[in-house]
UniProtKB/Swiss-Prot annotation:
It is found in: Cytoplasm; Dynein axonemal particle. Keywords: Cytoplasm, Phosphoprotein. One of its GO terms (biological process) is axonemal dynein complex assembly. This is Protein kintoun. Residues 416-430, 484-497, 670-691 have a biased composition (Basic and acidic residues).
């Protein structure tokens, strides 16, 4: 079976080899060519066409059907596309046999107007071929000549006529035409005119057979159409009631048809019987074929490829395509080619190689966690890695791993050894776990930092005593919340709380938690979202009596989201919040429920309800609770302290500034005991002699200057507690200092030089310190060792191994470079 080339007009002819040979030899005969030409002229002769129509009309009347041939008269031509694959032309023609247009005043509308009825006649589509082998389709829509005349005078009537013609073709033949890019051509008719047929039944029906005529032995001639019913002539079709007029909407740009083909380069090595031979699942190239039947050249279109998105825009004709590609491509090596014959744009895009991310090997500093340098990161919980109890876990962070910690949104110290991230400790509260994260100062080498070292009380000494203090947080009241308590210190690369909760250090595709400040009055809450350039149309909020959720985006296409939650006794009103947006921030006003008016104590904030952080309002109750923590020491004292004088200087949302001054305490009893021992003849130790030498230049009252607790912006309860513990330890250490400096009466000659050196070191006229909890400087308290009288160990028994005599030593002081963790270790000296 022979076929021509694909571009040949004869590609659809199904001819055998014998038929092709016979046609070839016949057209070589001049006589056959003359007869074939006469046959073609007879078919196109108008007179023969008229005689054909008369015979068809007479034959149809014998069956009781009236046939009328509708010859289209040229009007104007619309060019569009058919199903997005080929060109299509619609001839808007006229004929007097079609009903005339009519109109009536519009009803049921506030705008006065008229409703038009436009009868039309349709002819089946005809296919034609271009000289290059491409095909197009032509449809004829015939109206009354009056409708064409009105369309020539009124532009809006012409638009309505064209829209009616396109809609009629789509509904009748089930095709899709491109209305957006329909264009009126200058020609009046496209293709060869072909008459349509109007068939209507005669009023009297089919004529009866004559009485004397015998019946034909042959069956009736097969007829392609059913004869209309007898009662059909009586039922005159009435036009349907016109639908109410709708606002004419400009159609959107047309989305062209496209196909995406994944192309692989076949290599026989990938099909060997071996484990390492397997064809890759990722293709080498993506071939995108876009059908643009109305596009003449590639200059009329703009193509842009970025990553996994292909964008195509064209004005005339109006095309718009936004195609999401299955794989990221390398747009720098892509190529596009426009096929004018098929009106196709073929885009070939190489697939970008996937960049594998090797996991960084754990360094020895990271593998072996030194004491006091363990870190805890709560950012993983904000990304959904926390369990049902909201437990936050993190890896250890050291100096070499600062880059990885910055990517995870974890605060790292600027100077090593000044500030370290404390290890997260998980404690059991009623079957639930919470995670507390804080920072602490690392003591210098040689200073004791053990829990028993009272003189150098670092933060590690208070972690074991926080069981009662943590009840202030949300663990005991709200066991399902993951509490993250932080101490943010100035000057050490301060990181906002939202960075650890999914801030700019997180992945690009995830939502970020914005910085937020919350203030209150008795009837409402005011939220200040410190994010610039917020898009108003992107705000999506939801209000519940116990929580409030909001998500939005900025002009930089950064997505933010946060979640607020309150305790069951504090409820919000469900009315719509008031939102005010400026170029720098956004202010949201939430109303409190009428039965919950007043000042609230706490609120919970985070990226979602699985990672919430407790924050406290600045009110009188919270300040009083903080002052109580300052006054109460973290451990039991051996000697009663005179209550210090507390003066609150400043209370703000981010800072609490107080002045604590110790009152004068009399050491007459201690001095009296020393005097008695000296007069009795008991020798004084070298330490006591030194202390006595310095007592004359030391005032009996010590004061702690202004202590500023720079709380985290979140105002978490654990931050306040940790600051209270530091102040308490500091007050206790200062109260013990005058006790260690007691009077002396004599000094031995052999230790004069050593005593003078100790005297210079221990001489402190007025101990005045000013410290902020910022982690920049090592605590001066860690460099001091307070010598105290230990009850129950006022003497030591020493046995002589030679004669077995026992010597009782009442005053015994040992100098060492380390600190004992337990007082019982004195017996081993």
């Amino acid at each position: 079976m022979a076929k021509e080339a694909a571009s040949s007009p004869l590609e659809d002819l199904d001819l055998s080899g014998e038929e092709v040979q016979r046609l070839t030899s016949a057209f070589q005969d001049p006589e056959f060519r003359r007869m074939f030409s006469e046959y073609a002229e007879e078919l196109t002769d108008p007179e023969n066409r008229r005689r054909y129509e008369e015979e068809i009309t007479a034959l149809e009347r014998e069956r009781g059907v009236e046939v009328r041939f509708v010859h289209p008269e040229p009007g104007h031509v619309l060019r569009t596309s058919l199903d997005g694959t080929r060109r299509c032309f619609v001839n808007v023609c006229s004929n007097a046999l079609v009903g005339a247009p009519s109109s009536q005043p519009g009803s049921g509308s506030a705008v006065s107007g008229r409703q038009w009825s436009l009868p039309y006649s349709l002819a089946p589509g005809r296919e034609y071929a271009w000289g290059r082998g491409t095909r197009y389709t032509v449809y004829d829509v015939v109206f009354h000549p009056d409708a064409i005349a009105l369309a020539r005078r009124h532009e809006r009537f012409r638009q309505m006529l064209d829209a009616t013609a396109l809609e009629a073709v789509e509904k009748q033949f089930g095709v899709k035409l491109d209305r957006r890019n329909a264009k009126t051509l200058k020609i009046k008719y496209k293709g060869t005119p072909d008459a349509a047929v109007l068939r209507t039944p005669l009023p009297g029906g089919a004529p009866a057979r004559p009485e004397g005529e015998p019946e034909s032995p042959f069956p009736d001639f097969p007829y392609p159409y059913r004869y209309p019913a007898a009662g059909a002539s009586a039922a005159v079709p009435r036009p349907q009631a016109p639908s109410p007029p709708e606002a004419v909407r400009q159609p959107a740009p047309t989305e062209p048809r496209y196909s995406v083909v994944q192309r692989h380069h076949v290599d026989l090595q990938d099909y060997r019987c071996s484990r390492d031979s397997a064809p890759g699942t990722v293709p080498q190239e993506l071939v995108v074929t876009i059908e643009l039947p109305l596009l003449r050249s590639a200059e009329q279109a703009a193509l842009e490829v970025t990553g996994k998105l292909l964008c195509l825009d064209s004005r005339k004709p109006d095309y718009r395509l936004r195609l999401s590609l299955p794989y990221p491509v390398d747009d720098s090596r892509g190529k596009a080619q426009f096929n004018k014959a098929r009106r196709q744009l073929v885009v070939t895009l190489p697939v970008a190689p996937t960049a594998s991310r090797p996991e960084p090997a754990a360094s020895p500093e990271e593998a072996a966690d030194p004491p006091g340098t363990d870190g805890a990161a709560c950012a993983s919980a904000c990304r959904g890695e926390a369990g049902p109890a909201g437990v936050c876990a993190g890896d250890a962070i050291s100096g070499p791993s600062r880059t990885r910690a910055a990517d995870a949104g974890i605060t790292t110290p600027d100077a090593p050894g000044k500030e370290r991230v404390a290890k997260s400790e998980e404690r059991d509260f009623g079957g639930q776990e919470i995670s507390t994260t804080g920072t602490r100062e690392e003591p210098p080498s040689g200073a004791g930092n053990s829990p028993g070292d009272r003189g150098g009380g670092a933060l590690s000494t208070s972690w074991g005593d926080l069981d009662a203090g943590l009840s202030v947080g949300s663990a005991s009241v709200r066991p399902t919340l993951g509490v993250e308590a932080r101490e943010t210190r100035e000057g050490t690369g301060r990181e906002p709380a939202y960075r650890a909760m999914g801030g700019p250090g997180t992945d690009r595709g995830e939502a970020l938690c914005p910085p937020l400040q919350c203030s209150q009055d008795e009837e409402s809450l005011t939220l200040l979202v410190q994010v610039p350039w917020i898009l108003l149309q992107s705000l999506q909020g939801e209000v519940n009596p116990l929580w409030y959720k909001l998500s939005f985006s900025t002009q930089d296409l950064v997505y933010y989201s946060f979640f607020l939650q309150f305790t069951p006794e504090n409820k919000l009103s469900t009315k719509e919040p008031e939102v005010s947006i400026s170029s720098n921030n956004a202010v949201i006003n939430l109303a409190k429920s009428p039965e919950c008016h007043g000042y609230w104590r706490e609120w919970y904030y985070g990226l979602n309800n699985y990672c919430l952080e407790e924050r406290l309002f600045v009110n009188e109750d919270n300040v009083n609770e903080f002052l109580e923590e300052v006054l109460s020491p973290p451990f039991k004292q051996t000697l009663p302290l005179t209550p210090p004088l507390i003066e609150v200087l400043q209370v703000t949302d981010s800072k609490i500034e107080i002045h604590a001054k110790l009152q004068e305490c009399s050491n007459s009893e201690q001095l009296h005991e020393k005097e008695e021992r000296v007069h009795e003849g008991s020798p004084l130790t070298e330490k006591e002699n030194t202390e006595h030498a310095t007592i004359s230049t030391t005032d009996s009252a010590s004061s702690v200057a202004v202590t500023v607790l720079e709380a985290d912006r979140c105002g978490s309860a654990t931050c306040l507690q940790q600051g209270a513990l530091d102040v308490s330890q500091k007050l206790f250490a200062e109260s013990q200092q005058p006790k260690s400096e007691k009077e002396r009466e004599f000094i031995k000659d052999k230790s004069a030089v050593y005593a003078n050196e100790r005297k210079d070191n221990l001489k402190e006229p007025v101990i005045t310190e000013e410290k902020e909890l910022d982690g920049n400087h090592p605590s001066s308290l860690l460099n001091k060792t307070a010598v105290r009288d230990t009850p129950g160990f006022d003497h030591i028994k020493e046995t002589n191994m030679q004669d077995g005599s026992v010597q009782i030593i009442k005053d015994h002081v040992t100098h060492c470079s380390f600190s004992f963790q337990n007082n019982l270790l004195y017996d081993l000296d």
